[in-house]
């Protein structure tokens, strides 16, 4: 059976972010690294005890029937690993006839480890989406825009990447996502989301934080990112305030921290 995320590609707009076929069920989906995407307080579902081990006669063993409707949905959720936050995936495809806000497409939200991997395995990696496109992953109800109330006083850590390796680009983006949904930072409450920009000369990954004046939080997040992403000496992390980015572009934007 195809997942809900795969069926969604038939009506999502735009369609170019989805793979053309569902992954083989024989291959399975990759397991999230425990260091980055450990679920928050996963519920413990214990197996039923063997009546012979408990000493109870087999005839007294209660029989159960599969739940239906809403009960089935709730039961299924017990076997998933919940995340601490609900996250929303956005996709932007460049269209000069539309405003920036209208180009942003809210795709879907998820709140478990399993639903994250189901979504991730059915969309194209960043290296395969169109030039001028963006993926954004933000906490639910935060739009990937400077003007959003949750973002306008904040800033972002920016990693600029050359075009040499598609694999490195895809792996780096996945590691960023796992850091976000796995709450890998001491100041995870300051995290708003992350964006990857696919452009002609270079690509950018940015991690957005809520308060650009919170130096302690910004630096802790920056150092954790550098360690988690295993960035080399040629890849610097630069922290920029959104208010500066809104009035200047490219290399003209002042960086208040560099790691």
From Swiss-Prot:
Recognizes and binds the 7-methylguanosine (m7G)-containing mRNA cap during an early step in the initiation of protein synthesis and facilitates ribosome binding by inducing the unwinding of the mRNAs secondary structures. In 0-1 hour embryos, forms a complex with me31B, cup, tral and pAbp which binds to various mRNAs including maternal mRNAs, and down-regulates their expression during the maternal-to-zygotic transition. Residues 18-27 have a biased composition (Polar residues). Its main location: cytoplasm. Residues 1-70 are annotated as: Disordered. One of its GO terms (cellular component) is neuronal ribonucleoprotein granule. This is Eukaryotic translation initiation factor 4E1. Keywords: Cytoplasm, Initiation factor, Nucleus, Phosphoprotein, Protein biosynthesis, RNA-binding, Translation regulation. The lineage of its organism: Eukaryota, Metazoa, Ecdysozoa, Arthropoda, Hexapoda. Belongs to the eukaryotic initiation factor 4E family. MRNA binds at residues 100-101, 146-147, 199-204. Residues 54-70 have a biased composition (Low complexity). Signal peptide: none annotated. The gene is eIF4E1. The keyword Nucleus applies. It is found in: Cytoplasm, Cytoplasmic ribonucleoprotein granule; Cytoplasm; Nucleus, Nuclear body.
């Amino acid at each position: 059976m195809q997942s809900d995320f795969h069926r969604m590609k038939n009506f999502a707009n735009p369609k170019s972010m989805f793979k053309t076929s569902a992954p083989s069920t024989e291959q399975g989906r990759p397991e999230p690294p425990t260091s980055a995407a450990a679920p928050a307080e996963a519920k413990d579902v214990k197996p039923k005890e063997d009546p012979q081990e408990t000493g109870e006669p087999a005839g007294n063993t209660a029989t159960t029937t599969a739940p239906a409707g809403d009960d089935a949905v709730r039961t299924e959720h017990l076997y998933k690993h919940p995340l601490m936050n609900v996250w929303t995936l956005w996709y932007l495809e460049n269209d000069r006839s539309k405003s920036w806000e209208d180009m942003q497409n809210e795709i879907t939200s998820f709140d478990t480890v399993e639903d994250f991997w189901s979504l991730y395995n059915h969309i194209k990696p960043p290296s395969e989406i169109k030039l001028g496109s963006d993926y954004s992953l933000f906490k639910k109800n935060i739009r990937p825009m400077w003007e959003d109330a949750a973002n306008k006083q904040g800033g972002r850590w920016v990693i600029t990447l050359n075009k040499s390796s598609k694999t490195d680009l895809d792996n780096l983006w996945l590691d960023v996502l796992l850091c976000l949904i796995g709450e890998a930072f001491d100041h995870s409450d300051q995290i708003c989301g992350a964006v990857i920009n696919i452009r002609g000369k270079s690509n950018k990954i940015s991690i957005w934080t809520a308060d650009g004046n919170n130096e302690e939080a910004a630096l802790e997040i920056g150092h954790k990112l550098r360690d988690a992403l295993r960035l080399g000496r040629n890849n610097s992390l630069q922290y920029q305030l959104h208010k500066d980015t809104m009035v200047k572009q490219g290399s003209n934007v002042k960086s208040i921290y560099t790691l």
